[in-house]
């Protein structure tokens, strides 16, 4: 009983912390500005510009002091009196500041959790760096995989209710509810639903979405690990989560009453593995398709009865790993059969044994990557390199270093690919795009520019990756031939977005 209570225990030691007054502190908006700087592989670092200037922030805080937005009515004249002509700008600044404030609260929860629990309990707090080694080790022993698209249309009240479990400051929750309902049209869309793919206020909406996913995964992992004991567990230990046990019991009971009258341990699968990144998750298992279908309908009931979200069974696809390729984190991953020949000789008899083994293979999806290059004006939609407009005051070395940086980041991120042919094509596009950009700057032809610069210019794009990786792995990667044979996962978590978001 105590074990279950600790699994979903909420940190109540800081429940009297008040987050609402932080909205009146200028340094909060400075933090939002600093965190908002875009670290992108295919584009320059872009900040908020003048949107978060100290004058605008001070003016906003002054108006918030003069008239509390929590007591606003739905009258447009009162809203316009507060925001004036900068309604869109002020709403964006407040949303970014609110995201920073609530993230501070979640960071305190994490620190408190790590202080009270031993480090071994935090094995579920894994970064994306552990995903590919996990797939490499585990997927070769699994048989079936479910590619799940997590519902991203969430009602506003569900978001506020989810945050209520973690944030005990009523003023902040009232502000959040008011802010979402009153300024939803300004923020994203007339519909009262949040979507993961919103372009404006990404920090604010990604926080709301991730908090909702965190709640979903906590319930999912609890029911997954403790399902065999749910029937004998008292509902009193879940008092902190409103109607939690009733909803879980109903979701599981509906599923089992429609199929078998059996005990819940039949539902427990020790070989079930779960991986998620953003709006996509993968559940893989070694067992039969029957159990995978049971998990499928269980997830549907979980979303419908616990989160009140319409979730169609068609959003969960069950496939055999040997016949299916996963598009995940900028890679196209699959299981391929790799044959190995073993020769054994005893006296004069020579035996040759050919073994076929499953091997995790990851390839670079060239079409989506060319689409990203096209959006960044390095190539057209067909993959033909084009010149990129640059500032007239930029030097040749700055332009070359920028292209080299992009090539290096792409090579590092896709260093775990088993086939480098697509990566070579991308580097070829960037190399010629750099040549065309420099020729355009000097107003000369490409052939003339190459004659002036010599062959050493193109060699920089080929040697850059070898030099950097040889510093990282000096012993393993001794020759260039071996460099491209081995798989090494060198992910940059700060520059990942362009490679995994092809929308």
Curated annotation (Swiss-Prot):
Single GO BP term: RNA splicing
Entry keyword Chloroplast: yes
GO annotation, cellular component aspect: chloroplast
Alphabetized InterPro entries for the sequence: Domain_X (IPR024937), Maturase_MatK (IPR002866), Maturase_MatK_N (IPR024942)
Localization per Swiss-Prot or TrEMBL: Plastid, Chloroplast
UniProtKB keywords: Chloroplast, mRNA processing, Plastid, RNA-binding, tRNA processing
Entry GO MF terms: RNA binding
Role: Usually encoded in the trnK tRNA gene intron. Probably assists in splicing its own and other chloroplast group II introns.
Family to which the UniProt record says this protein belongs: Belongs to the intron maturase 2 family. MatK subfamily.
Protein's UniProt name: Maturase K
Species the sequence originates in: Backhousia myrtifolia (Grey myrtle)
Gene: matK
């Amino acid at each position: 009983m105590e074990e279950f209570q600790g699994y979903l225990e909420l940190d109540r030691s800081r429940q009297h912390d008040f987050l609402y007054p932080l909205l009146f502190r200028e340094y909060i908006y400075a933090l939002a500005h600093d965190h908002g700087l875009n670290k992108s592989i295919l584009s320059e670092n872009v900040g908020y510009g003048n949107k978060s200037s100290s004058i605008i922030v001070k003016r906003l805080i002054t108006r918030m002091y003069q008239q509390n937005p929590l007591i606003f009515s739905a009258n447009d004249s009162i809203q316009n009196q507060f925001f004036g002509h900068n309604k869109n700008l002020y709403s964006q600044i407040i949303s970014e500041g609110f995201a920073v404030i609530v993230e501070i609260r979640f960071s305190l929860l994490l620190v408190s959790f790590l202080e009270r629990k031993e480090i071994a309990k935090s094995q579920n707090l894994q970064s994306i760096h552990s995903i590919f080694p996990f797939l490499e080790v585990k997927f070769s022993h699994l048989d079936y995989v479910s590619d799940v698209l997590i519902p991203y249309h969430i009602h506003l009240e569900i978001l506020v209710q989810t945050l209520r479990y973690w944030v005990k400051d009523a003023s902040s929750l009232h502000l959040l509810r008011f802010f979402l309902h009153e300024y939803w049209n300004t923020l994203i869309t007339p519909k009262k639903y949040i979507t993961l793919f919103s372009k404006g206020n990404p920090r604010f909406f990604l926080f709301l979405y991730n908090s909702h996913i965190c709640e979903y995964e906590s319930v999912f992992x609890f029911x997954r690990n403790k399902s065999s004991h749910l029937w004998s567990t008292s509902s009193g230990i879940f008092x902190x989560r409103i109607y939690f046990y009733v909803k879980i019991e109903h979701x599981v009971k509906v599923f089992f009453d429609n199929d078998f009258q059996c005990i819940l341990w039949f539902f427990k699968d020790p070989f079930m593995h779960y991986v998620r990144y953003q709006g996509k998750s993968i559940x893989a298992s070694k067992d039969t398709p029957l159990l995978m279908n049971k998990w499928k309908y269980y997830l549907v009931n979980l979303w419908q009865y616990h989160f009140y979200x319409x979730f169609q069974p068609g959003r969960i696809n069950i496939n055999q790993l040997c016949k299916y390729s996963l598009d995940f984190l900028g890679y196209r991953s699959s299981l391929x059969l790799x044959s190995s020949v073993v020769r054994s000789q005893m006296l004069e008899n020579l035996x040759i044994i050919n073994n076929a083994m499953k091997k995790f293979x990851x390839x670079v999806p060239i079409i989506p990557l060319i689409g990203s290059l096209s959006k960044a004006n390095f190539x057209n939609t067909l993959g033909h390199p084009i010149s990129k407009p640059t500032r007239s005051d930029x030097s040749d070395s700055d332009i070359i270093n920028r292209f080299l940086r992009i090539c290096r980041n792409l090579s590092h991120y896709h260093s775990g690919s088993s086939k480098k042919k697509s990566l070579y094509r991308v580097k070829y596009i960037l190399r010629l795009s750099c040549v065309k950009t420099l020729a355009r700057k000097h107003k000369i032809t490409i052939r003339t520019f190459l004659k002036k610069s010599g062959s050493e210019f193109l060699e920089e794009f080929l040697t850059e990756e070898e030099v950097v990786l040889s510093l990282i792995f000096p012993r393993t990667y001794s020759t260039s031939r071996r460099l491209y044979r081995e798989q090494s996962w060198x992910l940059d978590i700060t520059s990942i977005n362009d490679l995994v978001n092809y929308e």
